[in-house]
Every structure is written in structure tokens, then in C-alpha cells.
């Protein structure tokens, strides 16, 4: 993996290290999403949104965590659980009941950073998904709110997030936990996707 990024990037940017360390679960999840054909029909898309809702439901306590909010100003406004819930209502799909395994987990700050890294990073890929949703006549006002471009733009939102993420001081063990949190987040979404498409 060391050949995939310049040495200075690997050493200095946590966001780049996390990208490298989570490449396998990320690629596995992308393949799983494609296999479910979420844009084949509105019903399939609703199942995809249900997984998105459950994932955002998992993350809701992190987006409203006071310690994290001190690090990331306006963090609560980045949450998408309400948008996904509204999309499910638009699509006539019941709101699934999430389990409490992640919400009640005793995540360290470093692990939480990994989970947020995955959630915030997914907003970049959501641009492609949002365009695909248009073929189902869904948009930021109906059915695809959670994929819509955030206020201020996707690129700027991500840039501001990683600028803070990359600047937080973590020791070696905390770096490991951040990577674990990110991998766990990718795997969790895969599990939720399997559940909603079962």
C-alpha cells in the first residue's frame, strides 16, 4: 500500500491514510451496493434509503456529541437522519427500527472520527447517486433529500471537515482506533444493506 501515496501525504494527512487503510472494505461495499441495483426501481431505492437511514440513525449521537461539536463547528447540521426519514415517507416505505449496538457502543473519540470520516466522505459519492435518482423522478425535494448537495457544496463541506480531521492530534493507538472506526463503519453499512434488501 505504501506505493499508492507520496510519503509526505501518508505521513501528514490522516484523511489520506484512512483512505488507504479502508480501501478494501470501501471497495467491497461499493460492489455490494451495485449488486443490489438500488436504481432499478423505486422499491429498490427505498430499500437503499432504509439502509442509509439506519446508518445515519447509528451516527446521530455522534453528530450531536458535544465534544465532537467543539472540534467540528456546526457538526449537528451535517447529520442526514431526518432527511433519510423524510425520503422514506415520500417513497411510502416504513421507517425501519434500528438496533442500538452502535448508538450504545462506548466509542472512543478516535473511533468516532473514523465513523464520521466515512459518513462525511459518502457525501462526495452521493453526487453520482443523486444523478441516478433523477431517473426515478426523485430529487432534493422528494425522495432523495439525503443525497442532495449540502449547503455550501460537497467539495467545500468535505474540505472543511478534513482540514479539521487532519489537524487533530492523535497518538499511535488512537490512529489505529480511527482506522478501526472507519472500517467498522463501512462494514456496518454493508450489514444494514443486506438487512434492508433481505
From Swiss-Prot:
What factors induce this protein? Increased transcription under iron starvation.
Key words, A-Z: Heme, Iron, Metal-binding, Oxidoreductase
Name of the molecule in the record? Heme oxygenase PigA
Query: Binding of heme b: at which residues?
Result: 26
| Alphabetized CDD domains for the sequence | HemeO-like
Output one GO MF annotation: metal ion binding
UniProt note: phenotype after gene disruption: Mutants are unable to use heme as a source of iron.
Q: Which InterPro entries match?
A: Haem_Oase-like, Haem_Oase-like_multi-hlx
Q: Domain of life, per the record?
A: Bacteria
What role is this protein assigned? Involved in heme degradation. Catalyzes the degradation of heme to biliverdin, with the release of iron. Forms biliverdin delta (70%) and beta (30%). Under anaerobic conditions ferredoxin--NADP(+) reductase (fpr) can provide the necessary electrons; Bfd is not required.
Catalytic activity from the UniProt record: heme b + 3 AH2 + 3 O2 + 2 H(+) = biliverdin IXbeta + CO + Fe(2+) + 3 A + 3 H2O; heme b + 3 AH2 + 3 O2 + 3 H(+) = biliverdin IXdelta + CO + Fe(2+) + 3 A + 3 H2O
* GO terms classed as biological process: cellular response to iron ion; heme oxidation
Q: Which organism is it from?
A: Pseudomonas aeruginosa (strain ATCC 15692 / DSM 22644 / CIP 104116 / JCM 14847 / LMG 12228 / 1C / PRS 101 / PAO1)
Instruction: Name the Enzyme Commission number(s) assigned to this protein.
Output: 1.14.99.58
Q: What family does the Swiss-Prot or TrEMBL record give for this protein?
A: Belongs to the heme oxygenase family.
Amino acid at each position: 500500500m505504501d506505493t499508492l501515496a507520496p510519503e509526505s501525504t501518508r505521513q501528514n494527512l490522516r484523511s489520506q491514510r484512512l483512505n488507504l487503510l479502508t480501501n478494501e472494505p470501501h471497495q467491497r461495499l461499493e460492489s455490494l451496493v451495485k449488486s443490489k441495483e438500488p436504481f432499478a426501481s423505486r422499491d429498490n431505492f427505498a430499500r437503499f434509503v432504509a439502509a442509509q437511514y439506519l446508518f445515519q440513525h447509528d451516527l446521530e449521537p455522534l453528530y450531536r456529541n458535544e465534544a465532537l461539536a467543539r472540534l467540528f463547528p456546526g457538526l449537528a447540521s451535517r447529520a442526514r437522519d431526518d432527511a433519510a426519514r423524510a425520503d422514506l415517507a415520500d417513497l411510502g416505505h416504513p421507517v425501519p427500527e434500528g438496533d442500538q449496538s452502535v448508538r450504545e457502543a462506548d466509542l472512543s473519540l478516535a473511533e468516532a472520527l473514523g465513523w464520521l470520516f466515512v459518513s462525511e466522505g459518502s457525501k462526495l459519492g452521493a453526487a453520482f447517486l443523486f444523478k441516478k435518482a433523477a431517473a426515478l423522478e426523485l430529487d432534493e425535494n422528494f425522495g432523495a433529500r439525503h443525497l442532495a448537495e449540502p449547503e455550501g457544496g460537497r467539495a467545500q463541506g468535505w474540505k472543511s471537515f478534513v482540514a479539521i480531521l487532519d489537524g487533530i492530534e492523535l497518538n499511535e493507538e488512537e490512529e489505529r482506533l480511527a482506522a478501526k472506526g472507519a472500517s467498522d463503519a463501512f462494514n456496518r453499512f454493508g450489514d444494514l444493506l443486506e438487512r434492508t434488501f433481505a
